[in-house]
Amino acid sequence: MTHYIFDMDGTLFQTNAVLAHALEDVFHDLRQAGQWEGETPLALYQQIMGVSLPEVWATLLPEFSLAEQQAADRQFRRSLEQAVEAGHGQLYPGTVELLARLKQAGHPVYIASNGWPSYLSAIVSTYGLATYIDHVYSIEDIASGDKSALVREICQMHDITSGYVV
């Protein structure tokens, strides 16, 4: 049996629309508090997308303390989930049809993502994906925070010997 492990952001879900919204929220508030001048660094974020959120904030806010970076991260997470739940994002064309075909053919489908669990859950529930996905795994499910290790763990847990990582 062939198994499929998909990434969520940038593979199934078009993240840019919700990212821009959430980043704008964070940097708007930083500007209001006098902690940031200039535009929201969306282009820089898009260049590093896929790294862990602590790495994101260390890159976007290098002069900020760890506590300030963590506060920005909490606000970003809240804003991102709200944007997803409000329908500001979208799946790539054909996503639901592909997942439905795979499921109908009996192929197990998993998600392995750098996203955190509540964010991934918001996408799955908002866009009706639960029917097609056997399990959603977050980078937070593995102590190392390494996505390759997460995929290896999924393969071991489900005794996967044949499949695709997309």
Regions found by a protein language model. Name each.
Residues 1, 106, 160-162:
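A general structural motif
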Residues 82-111, 121, 148-152:
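Short, acidic loop-to-helix structural element flanking the phosphoryl-transfer center
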Residues 116-165:
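Substrate-recognition "cap/lid" segment bordering the active-site pocket of phosphatases
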